[in-house]
């Protein structure tokens, strides 16, 4: 297939591609800036098929770098800028990264790399850009924590991104007024998928560095944007500061990261806010199941139906299985995990759910014990492994606690030795865990509830802690 950005420039060069900090740039202007940047990367030795890590944020430079690496045919490992130096080091080693490109702000998180300021000073060398893309090639790698606690690198091909964009547009439609407001991280699939859709559809991305509900509300009222991707905590913050509906041009508030509550759905209905609930994951290159507004109140708690190219079914044990061209071919350098994730061509989500008589999907447990905090996936086992390394901890169990701002935050229950010192434990956590993974509360208990086979019952802890 023709290189997407080059094709888009030929189709609609003067249409707006990016709006950042009030400045609009066309696809032609973005393409020229990307080509200049690709030349600098090329001068620094970056070539096709090399694994290049990118540690940036939601800004113009990171946006351009993502495109530039694709133009060169490099594979981009997207690093979460909230991770610790130790967590990042694991991903760099596991992915066998050739080079790291890092925003100046985050230089202390990587041992060595090309900083944005160094890149700016690099001389241009005419790059070898890819005219066409083999859709089976790997475009991006994103690490997702597994229940073992060790992150796995999800392989995302150009085909995955293409079919995700096609599936979405077949469901949501496309108009000449469309533009997508991106206040979710572009190092996450939720943000990267917006960038891919922008080029494939020919629509602008309104990129925001942070989620500021006041500023986002102004944009939603301005008529400039038609679509925004949010997680539950973002939506709830928007609803708190805004009493009415948004501009008529806003036609999709795409919600991921768990279904909305009945209260939220009723507020959206009363205010004529077009909420579209969805279910997806890093492994499905964004949403793969969606619930349109017309079904929202009739199907409270449902994630909807599989998008046109995808299929969903429930295994005998209740696990949600998915099939479709947007699903990852597997995990990087991890044949065992890849094989364990597929059964007869169906991807095993690890989530438990059911389909009602009309084929609507209901997710009962979000990967059983997964904590979703402000859109970030937190696995209790990863935190438990870190806390368990402290010699004064006999046993530990981590659960999610409801939180007004983040949706959910981790809480640790610990069976401790007499020598236990909470300050020491906090230091261990700060060294080994991203800030959002550090337990917001530590509760000392005499024993943890267990099954007959000795497995810790987190559900019992949740029940006890909620009383």
From Swiss-Prot:
Gene Ontology molecular-function annotations: ATP binding; o-succinylbenzoate-CoA ligase activity
A Pfam family of this chain: AMP-binding_C
Top-level lineage group: Bacteria
Catalytic activity: 2-succinylbenzoate + ATP + CoA = 2-succinylbenzoyl-CoA + AMP + diphosphate
Entries under PROSITE patterns matching the protein: AMP_BINDING (PS00455)
Pathway: Quinol/quinone metabolism; 1,4-dihydroxy-2-naphthoate biosynthesis; 1,4-dihydroxy-2-naphthoate from chorismate: step 5/7; Quinol/quinone metabolism; menaquinone biosynthesis
Gene Ontology biological process: menaquinone biosynthetic process
Enzyme Commission number(s) from the entry: 6.2.1.26
UniProt cross-references to CDD domains, sorted A to Z: OSB_CoA_lg
Record keywords, A-Z: ATP-binding, Ligase, Menaquinone biosynthesis, Nucleotide-binding
PANTHER family xrefs: ACYL-COA SYNTHETASE, MEDIUM-CHAIN ACYL-COA LIGASE ACSF2, MITOCHONDRIAL
HAMAP family listed in its UniProt record: MenE (MF_00731)
Known function: Converts 2-succinylbenzoate (OSB) to 2-succinylbenzoyl-CoA (OSB-CoA).
Entry's family note: Belongs to the ATP-dependent AMP-binding enzyme family. MenE subfamily.
Full protein name: 2-succinylbenzoate--CoA ligase
